[in-house]
Amino acid sequence: MDFDLSPDHELIRRTVREFAEGEVAPVAEELDRCKAFPYEIVAQLGKLNLMGIPFPEEYGGGGGDSLAYALAVEELARVDSSVAITLCAHTSLGTQPIYLFGSEEQKREWLPRLCSGEQLGAFGLTEPEAGSDAGNTRTRARPLDGEWVIDGAKQFITNAGTEISGVVCITAVTSDSDEAGGESGEGGAGGRKAGEATARAHPGAGNAGAGKEISNILVPNGTPGYEQGEPYRKMGWNASDTRPLSFTDCHVPEENLLGPRGQGFKQFLHILDIGRIGVAAMGVGLAQGALDEALKYAKERRAFGKPISKFQAIQGKLADMSTEIAAARLLVHKAALEKDAGRNFTLTAAQAKLKTGRLAVRCAEEAVQIHGGYGFIEEYPVCRFYRDAKILTIGEGTDEVQQMVIARALGA
């Protein structure tokens, strides 16, 4: 078992770390304070070929793997979670569905623009009555004269309302009733096989469990009837784009269906697994950033005639943070390697997501505590880290959902 990164992976990590420290960190506090989307940073990420890391070069991607992607996300989250989630949601949720389940025509149309960072992709799953219970989707799409007519609403959607947002992949009920249905058949590259392997380990898996025929449909920005609401006022991730979406008599061509009709539930379960690797990497990155700031401050801050880093109580906090981060990082890497090996990674991805979200919250809290009063001041990064951490136990599946997924995978 080799725990060393390959030269290519080391290069990715070093490149993104230098970019994050040199370009992102200096503006992170201002972007957060102004709630300004990081357009210039996204453009630079595109030029560095980081907006499409795990996709083939033939579609404009970086030709990397899931581990390379996780390393990049971690390094960005180490200095700013808003930039990290922008890349993460774009790659795992916005672009992956098209690559995995799209037709060759859909891939040729969308992937080059998404992988270059020219446009952002989004994934519209969550609804007012369909969060953890994603099978309770109420958005409907009915076929009419060679089109899909969509009506419904989504909420908490990332990347859908920026000036460079290009397309959102939404889940919608495509049956005339709420009875389960759906055609068989192959999706894109390994789509149906991957979805079915994943579905078995999830609560409510399969369209029969959801009780509805759910399909995924691509809706380009600018389509009449598709509107993006005002961005939410959030606790954290203030420089990322998060808003509700509405669809009113929204017409898209029938060929915008992603994969076979009725396979949407299985598809998005697989997409969520992939997304959990990215969000878990964010948790490791935020925790590492909190440790970095805490250690730096502890070595500079003096009390009772010596740096507070010399006090056993502070050393214990730093040691525990470091140890937990090292263990969590290995779990994230294991999930990424399992995915790249073509193995079922549902269990490991859920474990990584559960572990790292909780770890990020604890490390951010400890970092604030070590900073004392300064940890409560916005100019110090740990204050932002503290606000950004909590969502990592909620987004991409709550901790409680991860526990359900893990227990089911264990056969409980």
Label each residue range with its predicted role.
Residues 1-79, 83, 89, 101-106, ...:
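Alpha-helical interface subdomain recognition
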Residues 75-76, 102, 125-128, 144-146, ...:
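Fold-independent oxyanion-binding glycine-rich loops
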Residues 95-101, 123, 135, 177:
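Flexible, glycine-rich active-site loops centered on histidine and acidic residues
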Residues 117-125, 170-171:
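A short, Trp-centered hydrophobic/proline-enriched beta-strand micro-motif
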Residues 129-132, 158-163, 207-209, 234-241:
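Short Gly/Pro-enriched turn/cap motifs at secondary-structure boundaries
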Residues 138-140:
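Short, surface-exposed charged micro-motifs
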Residues 151-227:
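A short core secondary-structure module
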Residues 207, 222-251:
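Flexible, small-/acidic-enriched active-site or ligand-binding loops
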